[in-house]
A protein has these predicted regions:
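Short beta-strand segments in beta-sandwich/barrel cores
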Residues: 15-16, 33-37, 51
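Short beta-strand His + acidic residue motifs that chelate non-heme Fe in jelly-roll/DSBH
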Residues: 18, 36-37, 59-66
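A short beta-loop-beta micro-motif enriched in histidine and acidic residues
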Residues: 1, 13-26
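Structural recognition of the beta-strand scaffold that forms the well-ordered cores
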Residues: 18, 26-28, 53-54, 70-75
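Double-stranded beta-helix
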Residues: 1-4, 63-93
């Protein structure tokens, strides 16, 4: 296993394409706000300072808030395997 750390920026009002990761994901919102949209769950507003755990294989497509969002994301990943899978449907780009 390996841990991948990403600095993720979502522009104001932009939606990340629907996708999932085979491993668990830990998100800490550094700046701005976002809405976490996850299949099968109610939309979750997030603000700077909030954290959230996304379970393995959870299809999600976050949306940047009015000022956008910046998050540090820690992803547990099996080394050598694909880390992100796009899912067609609403929010797909």
């Amino acid at each position: 296993l390996e841990v991948i750390v990403s600095d993720v920026v979502i522009p104001p009002g932009a939606q990340v394409p629907r996708h999932y990761h085979p491993g668990e994901e830990f998100l800490y919102l550094v700046e701005g706000s976002a809405v976490h949209v996850e299949e099968g769950k109610p939309d979750l507003p997030l603000n700077a300072g909030d954290s959230y755990v996304i379970p393995p294989n959870a299809v999600h497509a976050p949306i940047g808030g009015p000022q956008g969002a910046r998050a540090v994301v820690f992803r547990v990943h099996v080394k050598g395997r694909q880390e992100r899978y796009l899912v067609p449907g609403p929010g797909a780009q």
